[in-house]
Amino acid sequence: MNLQILSWNVRGLHERDKRLQIKNLIRMWRADIICMQETKMELITRGFVRSLWGCHYVDWVYLGSLGASGGILVMWDSRVVENLEEAVGHYSVSCRFKNVGDNFEWAFTSVYGPNVDRERRLLWEELSGLHSWWNVPWCVLGDFNVVCFPTERLGTINFTQAMHDFLDFISVHGLLDIPMAGGRYTWSNSVSRSKIDCFLFSPNWEDHYPKISQRRLAKVVSDHFPIILEGGAIQKGRRPFCFENMWLQVEGFMGKVKNWWDSYQFQGTPSYRMAMKLKALKADLKKWNELEFGNVVVKKNTTVE
């Protein structure tokens, strides 16, 4: 199945005219899951959700704001995903979803990160605890209020401890941060720009959605750009890639793999470069296997028969 997820810091949902604009945009974007950060709403009702997303099949879960600060709303089309379990933390809203079309189970988290360094560490602890609890493929997104690299904030040249902590979180959980089409930054005002909103996901989540991409949309009614993640699932009946032990018996195999690996050159974050190199290696292994052995699946089936 194909899946579209929208993430957007809307900077408040109190104004009726603003909600009407957002409703029209939601209708145009046609996402399956919609996440809004900084709602500034302490209470969200079904009627309020309907004022944003007119879909009869919409379901939702939210984290209320503290007065006029913060707040997260996650909405989804229940014809596309079923919510098996949910967890509302101090900085995040999470759901354990099951796809209606193919029964794939995965975890989903929308984040609104704090601006204070000592609180950010509580965010990483909150997310890490959730990941170990559910232990399924994971997609985490939102406004983290921190960047990974100095290049992601205009005018910044040095790493900060907050950046190192964010990178450590990404590395520990093996998350991928793929390039974003449509623009470099996700937040801007008259003098500053930064990429503080993003999608991250685990490799086993990407395995199910191998044609994944993220794109920045036009900035309207907020100083944050909406971003959308679009993914196509594995076609039904497609055999997952797996390493064949017989390859190790081929003379020069390990040297060939090393030469392939050293030849791959990609630009981006360390996790993205690693993911792209693994994809390239998988493609080369498949081509080499067909030349060296033919179709392994056919041979195995023939042997059984």
Pin down the residues of each PLM region:
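A shared catalytic/ligand-binding motif for oxyanion handling
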Residues: 1-305
